Regions:
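Basic, flexible Lys/Arg- and Gly-enriched helix-loop patches that mediate nucleic-acid binding at interfaces
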Residues: 2-172
């Protein structure tokens, strides 16, 4: 059984895979694989578990190269065109948003997603914590969308939208 002091020590710092991902070296999953491959050392000792928490004072190396410190948190606006999938990879081989970004951009994450046939503002960030905070419905932030409809929908067709519809357990109003 964990005591409060032991629990505090375990929770200090961040998981090493998260720190590697935050530094822009690799995704969290790729960082976990790099760790399991024995390529990561913390304070000179090779580690084989991604469960290790590290503090900012710890020296992390990958293949004996010191991991750079994480860059400042940034947020970019991207005007997503129709026809791109909001994903890092698409199992169907379709073009993804990340294929369209400038090569000079650091590794970024999309905040939410837009459907393949949708266009408009997509936020990108280099910080997974910010991404999660912006995506969570519990933040209570109002999201507004502008929708274009092809043709002229009838009142009967629009009535459910005017009454509000449930999407992902949330009541949405127009």
């Amino acid at each position: 059984m964990l005591t409060k002091d032991m629990d505090k020590k375990i929770k200090q710092g961040d998981r090493v895979a998260k720190v590697i991902a935050r530094a822009g070296f690799a995704s969290r999953r790729a960082a976990e694989k790099i760790i399991l491959d024995g390529r990561v050392a913390v304070n000179g000792k090779t580690i084989l578990s991604a469960a290790l928490n590290v503090k900012p004072t710890d020296k992390i190396t990958i293949d004996e190269i010191i991991l750079p410190t994480a860059p400042a948190t940034r947020l970019w606006k991207y005007n997503k065109p129709v026809g791109l999938v909001t994903s890092e990879k698409d199992e169907k081989g379709r073009k993804v948003v990340f294929d369209n970004l400038p090569a000079s951009l650091p590794r970024v994450l999309s905040v939410g997603r837009l459907d393949l046939n949708s266009e408009g503002l997509l936020l990108l960030t280099n910080d997974g914590v910010l991404k999660r905070k912006l995506e969570l419905p519990s933040t209570g932030w109002t999201r507004k969308y502008r929708v274009r409809v092809n043709g002229e929908p009838s009142i009967k067709l629009l009535q459910p939208l005017m009454n509000g519809i449930i999407i992902d357990l949330s009541l949405i109003h127009i």
